[in-house]
């Protein structure tokens, strides 16, 4: 299986490589196809992300994106916003679960609970 890997900026490169190493250690059949995006890439090219990235995500159906920086006050809109607009994905969906031994306002929340937030 092929999947797009977008390492991103700063620590993104490090943690993305860790994910690649983990998938290899687990003998998962993933061929990572790397594309660049983020502030570091934009500083070199004046583009938010590498040409072909959107087409690769459409083709492979899977992508892992590391953290990306966004210049404040100047430059481009965030990589997250650009990708959300390209793919019309505006929902931020998060699973919610309670853990035994951890006090919280709500107890016994199963993994079947979800938080939905609109992302623009």
Q: How should these model regions be labeled?
A:
Residues 1-10, 39-120:
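Anion-binding alpha/beta catalytic cores of soluble intermediary-metabolism enzymes, centered on
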Residues 1-36:
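N-terminal phosphate-binding or glycine-rich loops at protein starts, especially the Walker A/P-loop
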